[in-house]
Regions:
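C-terminal cap/loop subdomain of S1 sulfatases and analogous C-terminal strand-loop tails that border
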Residues: 146, 157, 163, 278-284, ...
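Active-site-proximal cap/lid insertion segments
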Residues: 34-35, 40, 156-162, 170-269, ...
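Active-site-proximal N-terminal segment of extracellular/periplasmic enzymes that hydrolyze or transfer
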Residues: 19-58, 67, 179, 408-419
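Short, structured active-site-proximal loop/turn typified by the sulfatase FGly-forming signature C/S-X-P-X-R
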Residues: 41-74, 80-85, 110-115, 194-195, ...
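A short aromatic-rich beta-strand->coil structural motif
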Residues: 24-32, 108, 120, 165-168, ...
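Short, solvent-exposed turn/loop segments enriched in Gly/Ser/Thr/Pro and often Arg
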Residues: 39-41, 57-81, 94-95, 117-127, ...
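Long, internal low-complexity/basic segments
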Residues: 19-22, 29, 33-34, 59, ...
Length: 440
């Protein structure tokens, strides 16, 4: 009899542990900058549903993408590696076979979760192939019907037999790319009013003295990506109007998912994470789209709603990399095995503590490759007080900004003698990171 009981006793803690693990709902937009939310005081748009998540959760104000381009950023999220480690530094490059079977969906599934994916995958195919990377595809890359597919999933999982991991990945506000190219928008309709009704220009609209000159060079070499060279001030204001309407459009879709979470009483045992793969220039420094290392492009929204809405409404300043750190955090919450060689730092403990002074990590790095132009490489090192940027070519390729006094990055301190030691410290941090991550 004892030999029959042993396997049952061994399974009991696992079953209990699985029941206690939270569901995970990951809501992701494409190309949304951190300031494109009304809950942080932006009066140029209204995002009531994202605001609902912020009121219920913890907002990380210093969350950064691992790469300011969709394919590399998403590959990093779902593998736990930086894009250069994968060789996925351009859109259209597939995740290598060496890690395809150890991606996040597979690992979380092996930990006992049901994994479902709805919407844009883009790592590298537009939609996730059904059954690959550990996910069941419940809706292809199309914002129309995406929220409804997620609502149907949640309605059928109000009392799940096992925990679930649901990804809702929207395309918008990415349609701003088509807007800039004067093309039809795939997933939204926008009528731009008279310019007098459009948002004003950002405070950091002008190209700053001592800005890296390679940025404008890259812009000139990729007109299809950056068709804004001849934009007037009014054109930029229209661009900003369209961008904020696209954010509001996707906010309405997110609201359907939030309503379903309410309806099915899922808050008590669910972690809901809202974020984006990267931001958009939104006219700052005369920039649209991504790839560059301005904060409008690299600083992304990140809201974490904990089970029972613990620490609701708190804002935390800890530095987050929404590539490897997201991967590590999901492994932490689900009990999935985190592969050796992935270096992400889980933000679970910081979110659950709600302590703005809790130790997390001293800096985060974002890496970029301008994939259609001069092929410029760049890295940014964000510390609690400063941001250091290095491009591999051009004049003024080093940038240093005081992120308390100059969040708009208008005064490059790298050219000022008084900040020579701070500059050296950040150079050493980047050198340390490059050695650790094998960047030559």
């Amino acid at each position: 009899m004892r030999h029959l009981l042993k396997p049952l006793l061994a399974l009991a803690p696992i079953t209990t542990m699985a029941a206690q693990r939270p569901n995970i709902i990951y809501i992701m937009t494409d190309q949304q900058t951190a300031t494109a939310m009304s809950c942080i005081g932006n009066t140029d748009l209204h995002t009531p549903n994202i605001d609902r998540l912020a009121a219920a959760g913890v907002t990380f104000t210093n969350a950064y993408c691992s790469s300011p381009l969709s394919g590399p950023s998403r590959a990093s999220m779902f593998t736990g590696y930086m894009a250069h480690e994968l060789g996925v530094e351009r859109n259209g490059t597939p995740i290598p076979d060496s890690v395809r079977t150890r991606t996040l969906g597979t690992l979380v599934g092996e930990a006992g979760y049901e994994c479902a994916y709805a919407g844009k995958w883009h790592a590298h195919t537009a939609s996730i192939p059904d059954g690959e990377f550990g996910f069941r595809n419940i809706h292809n890359h199309d914002d129309a019907g995406l929220a409804e597919a997620c609502v149907d999933f949640l309605n059928s999982h109000s009392k799940p037999q096992r925990p679930f991991f649901l990804v809702a990945s929207f395309d918008n506000p990415h349609n701003i790319c088509e807007f800039a190219r004067q093309q039809d928008l795939p997933f939204a309709d926008i009528t731009v009013p008279d310019v007098s009704e459009c948002p004003g220009l950002p405070a950091n609209y002008a190209i700053s003295p001592y800005d890296a000159d390679i940025i404008q060079r890259e812009k000139s070499l990729n007109y299809s990506g950056y068709p804004t060279t001849s934009y007037t001030d009014d054109d930029w204001r229209r661009y900003r109007y369209a961008y904020y309407r696209l954010v509001e459009h996707v906010d309405k879709e997110i609201g359907k998912i939030v309503d379903a979470i309410d309806k099915n009483s899922l808050w008590r045992n669910t972690v809901v994470i809202f974020t984006s793969d990267h931001g958009d220039g939104t006219g700052a420094h005369h920039w649209n789209q991504k790839s560059v290392l301005y904060d409008e492009v690299t600083n992304i929204p990140m809201i974490v709603v904990l089970p029972g809405k613990k620490n609701a409404g708190k804002k935390l300043p800890q530095l987050i990399n929404n590539g490897p750190d997201f991967f590590a955090s999901i492994c932490d919450w689900t009990g999935a095995d985190k592969p050796k060689g992935t270096r992400g730092v889980s933000y679970r403990n910081v979110a659950e503590s709600g302590n703005a002074n809790a130790q997390h990590q001293p800096y985060v790095v974002t890496e970029t490759l301008f994939d259609k132009g001069a092929g410029t490489l760049g890295w940014s090192v964000r510390t609690p007080d400063f941001k250091y940027v290095l491009y591999d070519k051009g004049r003024y390729r080093e940038q240093l900004y005081d992120m308390h006094r100059d969040r708009g990055e208008t005064r490059n301190l790298a050219v000022e003698k008084a900040y020579a030691e701070t500059l050296s410290q950040h150079r050493r941090m980047l050198e340390e990171w490059m050695q650790q991550y094998g960047v030559k």
